[in-house]
């Protein structure tokens, strides 16, 4: 509770709620994928050189849109994007967190009804870093939160 953590502002909970809402939207897209013709390749490769799936692109857009609108998020980094997205300048220091994610891990399993999910990690944004991107290069022990949402 907030009484147990006097420095808590609710910002982390607000970010987790964006991830939760994103997961509900993505789960619905995965569930209805065959019906609305969003299975298969999107026609581009991701940064690892893998063929991007249509649902990879859709899931990435959902997460970027919802996380980008949350106060407290400074940087968002996705497996589907070559560069991290800096949400906004933050002269007041209110944007305290970086969110890293794979929007649809295992998307190549969709054609065979294999399991897919979203992997995420939340780190504190280091405003003292020489480059904003350096905030993303932290050991796992520095994670504030991390998780995997399994869709099926």
Language-model features: locations:
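N-terminal subdomain of lithium-sensitive/metallo-dependent phosphomonoesterases centered on the IMPase/IPPase/PAP
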Residues: 1-104
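DPxDG-like acidic metal-binding loop motif
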Residues: 94-151
């Amino acid at each position: 509770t907030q009484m147990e953590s006097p420095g808590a502002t609710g910002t982390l909970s607000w970010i987790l709620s964006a991830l939760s809402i994103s997961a509900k939207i993505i789960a619905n897209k995965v569930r209805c994928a065959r019906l609305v013709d969003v299975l298969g390749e999107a026609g581009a490769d991701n940064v690892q050189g893998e063929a991007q799936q249509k649902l990879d692109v859709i899931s990435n857009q959902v997460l970027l849109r919802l996380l980008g609108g949350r106060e407290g998020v400074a940087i968002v980094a996705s497996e589907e994007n070559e560069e991290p997205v800096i949400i906004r300048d933050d002269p007041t220091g209110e944007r305290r967190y970086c969110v890293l994610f794979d929007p649809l891990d295992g998307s190549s399993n969709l054609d065979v009804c294999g399991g897919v999910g979203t992997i995420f990690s939340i780190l504190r944004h280091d405003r003292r870093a020489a480059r904003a991107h350096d905030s993303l290069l932290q050991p796992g022990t520095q994670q504030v939160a991390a998780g995997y949402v399994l869709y099926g």
